[in-house]
């Protein structure tokens, strides 16, 4: 990179299925965190001159959700609606970070095992629509491991749209052992919506689903022993908590608080045949070389918003200990900032001096086209 490019701080943008985390390389937390939502008015505008827009992004869409239909352009970690995604990136650069993308190298993130076309299109939009000088696409789980200060370990990264186990040895992800589950925060929100219906509380619109997400984030936790917790909930009201809805109505929830995230350990709750997160972690370790398993067991790193439930680390410890050889030392690392650890890892990576030759530059892109991304980012 030439000297005038170097004073341009890199931008780190972690596009999650649920939240966009964006900011500047070298910072210790993202400047902008907003929902990956694009909202469009449900009804025709009647007030002339209100300056109604045809679409709203992020927090603005969230605050006007009552009159909008909300759509998430990223589903299960894969971008399904590129026009909306472009709106989100535009909003990120110009409204949230207030920078000109053509002046800053940009680091984007993606889920492991994503379709190749996905990262090519990302590369193309960055260079052709936003004219960035340089860009890079990094695997989310690898960044989380960097953020925890390790180069070897197995990451369980669970966000809103997707969860995956990624074993990493000396900084390299081991692709044959990666496990990907399409079970994550959004599915848990759906499930909580369903079990709240059994209590007679109904949440129907896209806007009301957001209320359920808030209930989930504030009140849910993972039980150490599910059966025992169910018994406690049945025999006393000690586990009940109340939540005030935006209209002032107060609802009470009891065993739903831990039944919802229990789905991570028992996906059959929502009719999925997949193994629970403890089994996928174990299976992923078992697919790795026998010599490195010990290091993986001792470095189980949790990352992403869906690992934020109280009690999840203790439960993982218990479940993996039950599966692993009895003498094995097992350690679950749950950093308090794990909601943003992918972003933090990106901030660390892109501010390393050695990373300068890793960027895909505009010149390289012009010469080789979008497929350059597979050669330079792995």
Swiss-Prot record:
One Pfam family recorded for the sequence: Actin
Q: Which SUPFAM superfamilies match?
A: Actin-like ATPase domain
- Reaction equation(s) it catalyzes: ATP + H2O = ADP + phosphate + H(+)
Quote one Gene Ontology molecular function term. Answer: ATP binding
Q: Name one GO cellular component term.
A: cytoskeleton
Keyword ATP-binding part of the UniProt annotation = yes
Keywords from the UniProt entry:
ATP-binding, Cytoplasm, Cytoskeleton, Hydrolase, Nucleotide-binding
Give the EC class as a word: hydrolase
This enzyme's EC code(s): 3.6.4.-
Briefly state the protein's biological role. Answer: Actins are highly conserved proteins that are involved in various types of cell motility and are ubiquitously expressed in all eukaryotic cells. Multiple isoforms are involved in various cellular functions such as cytoskeleton structure, cell mobility, chromosome movement and muscle contraction.
The Swiss-Prot or TrEMBL record describes its family as follows:
Belongs to the actin family.
The name this protein goes by in its record: Actin, larval muscle-type
């Amino acid at each position: 990179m030439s000297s005038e490019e170097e004073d341009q701080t890199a931008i780190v943008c972690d596009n999650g299925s649920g939240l966009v985390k964006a900011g500047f390389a070298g910072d210790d937390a993202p400047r902008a965190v907003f929902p990956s939502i694009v909202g469009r008015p449900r009804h025709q505008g009647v007030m002339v001159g209100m300056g109604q827009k045809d679409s709203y992004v992020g927090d603005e869409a969230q605050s006007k959700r009552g009159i909008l239909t909300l759509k998430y352009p990223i589903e299960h970690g894969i971008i399904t609606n590129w026009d909306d995604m472009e709106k989100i990136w535009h909003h990120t650069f110009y409204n949230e970070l207030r920078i000109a993308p053509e002046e800053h190298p940009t680091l984007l993130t993606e889920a492991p095992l994503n379709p190749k076309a996905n990262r090519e299109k990302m590369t193309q939009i960055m260079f052709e629509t936003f004219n960035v000088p340089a860009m890079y696409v990094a695997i989310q789980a690898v960044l989380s491991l960097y953020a925890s200060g390790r180069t070897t370990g197995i990451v369980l990264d669970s966000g809103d749209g997707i969860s995956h186990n990624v074993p990493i040895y000396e900084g390299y992800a081991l692709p044959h052992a990666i496990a990907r589950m399409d079970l994550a925060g959004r599915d848990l929100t759906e499930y909580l919506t369903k079990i709240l219906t059994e209590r007679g509380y109904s949440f129907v619109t896209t806007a009301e689903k957001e209320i359920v997400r808030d209930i989930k984030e504030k009140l849910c936790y993972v039980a150490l022993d599910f059966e025992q917790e169910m018994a406690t909930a049945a025999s006393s009201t000690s586990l009940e908590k109340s939540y005030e809805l935006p209209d002032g109505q107060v609802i009470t929830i009891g065993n739903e608080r831990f039944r919802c995230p229990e789905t991570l350990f028992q996906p059959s709750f929502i009719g999925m045949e997949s193994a629970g997160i403890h089994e996928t972690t174990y299976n992923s370790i078992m697919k790795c070389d026998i010599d490195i398993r010990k290091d993986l067991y001792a470095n189980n790193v949790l990352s992403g918003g869906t690992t934020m439930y109280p009690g999840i680390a203790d439960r993982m410890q218990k479940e993996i200990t039950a599966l692993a050889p009895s003498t094995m030392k097992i350690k679950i690392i749950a950093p308090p900032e794990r909601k943003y650890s992918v972003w933090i890892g990106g901030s660390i990576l892109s501010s390393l001096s050695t990373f300068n030759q890793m960027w895909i530059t505009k010149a390289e892109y012009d010469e080789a086209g979008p497929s350059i991304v597979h050669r330079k980012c792995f």
